[in-house]
From Swiss-Prot:
One of its GO terms (molecular function) is alpha,alpha-trehalose-phosphate synthase (UDP-forming) activity. UDP-alpha-D-glucose binds at residues 21-22, 262, 267, 339, 365-369. Homotetramer. Belongs to the glycosyltransferase 20 family. The keyword Repeat does not apply. Keywords: Glycosyltransferase, Transferase. Pathway: Glycan biosynthesis; trehalose biosynthesis. It comes from the Bacteria. This is Trehalose-6-phosphate synthase. CDD domains: GT20_TPS. One of its GO terms (biological process) is trehalose biosynthetic process. It comes from Salmonella choleraesuis (strain SC-B67). Residues 454-473 are annotated as: Disordered. D-glucose 6-phosphate binds at residues 10, 76, 130, 300.
Length: 473
């Protein structure tokens, strides 16, 4: 039986007691089924030459390493999060390309390949995750690794007009073709990748999803990531902590609109605040009878763009509350802090509306978690951006354009006044999709397809001559 090797920028610690996110749940499920290794950065800076830190529990080994301060800055902060992240979320105006950062990104991917190489066994299958590791298969191929290597992109893949604006776009595209299987959240993302490829080289396609580019065989497929709906339902339905129970009692005559995500410019938070203001302005009958709570803990606080959006939200929240607030009623609560995941599931359950309106998102698991947390007999309503990957599956949500504040305001009004029968029907349809496409099905489909790939032979590998692009000067 093939062993599974998972590679991601960060690894979830084996003693993690908190609620695991989607990637951790899916990866651990796959690793428990096959046995294997989870390899990645420890999240700490230090001496890169130190031996790997290894922990084994059952049939799973966690192996992690430190990054130097310089590599952390170049690979993680400057290239992954100041170039790839904004570009892949259609924000070229925020891209800060610097050649030393690109060189650091390539250097760290090569370093990771060097560290992983001694741990790889002949029949291992390798599953690589996300935008930090786009060149990783290419680095392994250079070192003679012919194992099956799959890649899953958790964030959107941009259209060629966006992607080709990146100075190393051609290098990145050819490196991606060294994976055997490329997985995307949506069909739009898969097609955007292929369109970018076609803009750079000839691509031969067989059976729709088997391709050859630069002499390299690879497959593309769509794997929308899911959640654990049963676990979320259990967390949501449990007894409320005393403070939350008291708050719920105080707000029993107020309808609650709730949002939670990390503080990021891709989430559309300023636009969301303005849409809520439009709701109060266009539908004054709701004043004093609703409350919008936005939880947005700080993320990447050292990046100027994130500092700017935090200050913008603080300003907008104060302005809206000053304009529409009344004695005894505050229309908008903005909390820039972290809350326990299990507590959030309980807040989801007693919320009347879940407001999830990113400007661009690979999937957005918060939308799925909101649905899974609801009481099926009296569910809340999901208002969801058309630019979230989840909108392709959760078609019974109220789908909105987050750039159109009046459209979002109208959807909020409809959600707040929706009859129970319609709420139940819409919720049941979405829950059915979420249960069928849960996190386990996501990883099982990907691993099954990766195992079906024909391994690359050394002869074919030599013929392909991986990473043939000229070095970026």
């Amino acid at each position: 039986m093939s062993r599974l090797v998972v590679v991601s920028n960060r690894i979830a610690p084996p003693d993690n007691k908190g609620g695991a996110g989607g990637l951790a749940v899916g990866v651990l499920g796959a690793l428990k089924a096959a046995g294997g290794l989870w390899f990645g950065w420890s999240g700490e800076t230090g001496n890169e030459d130190e031996p790997l830190k290894k922990v084994t529990k059952g049939n799973i080994t966690w192996a992690s390493f430190n990054l130097s301060e310089q590599d952390y800055e170049d690979y993680y902060c400057q290239f992954s999060n100041a170039v790839l992240w904004p570009a892949f979320h259609y924000r070229l105006d925020l891209v800060q390309f610097q050649r030393p950062a690109w060189e650091g990104y390539m250097r760290v991917n090569a370093l990771l390949a060097d560290k992983l190489l001694p741990l790889i066994k002949e029949n291992d299958i390798i599953w690589v995750h996300d935008y930090h590791l786009l060149p990783f298969a290419s680095e392994l191929r250079k070192r003679g690794v012919n194992n099956r290597i799959g890649f899953f992109l958790h964030i959107p893949f941009p259209t060629p007009e966006i992607f080709n604006a990146l100075p190393p776009h051609d290098e990145l595209l050819e490196q991606l073709c060294d994976f055997d299987l490329l997985g995307f959240q949506t069909e739009n993302d898969r097609l955007a990748f292929l369109d970018s490829l076609l803009s750079q080289t000839r691509v031969t396609t067989r059976s729709g999803k088997q391709h050859i580019a630069w002499g390299k065989d690879f497959q593309t497929e769509v794997y929308p990531i899911g959640i654990e709906p049963d676990e979320i339902a259990l967390q949501a339905a449990g007894p409320l902590p005393p403070k939350l129970a008291q708050l719920k009692a105080e707000l029993k005559n107020v309808k609650n609109i709730f949002s939670v995500e990390r503080l990021d410019y891709s989430k559309g938070l300023p636009e969301r605040f303005l849409a809520y203001e439009a709701l109060l302005e266009n539908y004054p009958q709701h004043r004093g009878k609703i409350r919008y709570t936005q939880i947005a803990p700080t993320s990447r606080g050292e990046v100027q763009a994130y500092q700017d959006i935090r200050h913008q939200l603080e300003t907008e929240a104060g302005r809206i509350n000053g304009k529409y607030g009344q004695l005894g009623w505050t229309p908008l609560y903005y909390l820039n802090q972290h809350f326990d995941r299990k507590l959030l599931m309980k807040i989801f359950r007693y919320s009347d509306v879940g407001l999830v309106t990113p400007l661009r998102d690979g999937m957005n698991l918060v939308a799925k978690e909101f649905v899974a947390a609801q009481d099926p007999a009296n569910p809340g309503v999901l208002v969801l951006s058309q630019f979230a990957g989840a909108a392709n599956e959760l078609t019974s949500a109220l789908i909105v354009n987050p750039y159109d504040r009046d459209d979002v305001a109208a959807a909020l009004n409809r959600a707040l006044t929706m009859p129970l029968a319609e709420r139940i029907s819409r919720h049941a349809e979405m829950l059915d999709v979420i249960v069928k496409n849960d996190i386990n099905r996501w990883q099982e489909r990907f691993i099954h397809d990766l195992k079906e790939v024909t391994p690359r032979s050394p002869e074919r590998q030599q013929q392909n001559n991986v990473a043939t692009f000229p070095k970026l000067a």
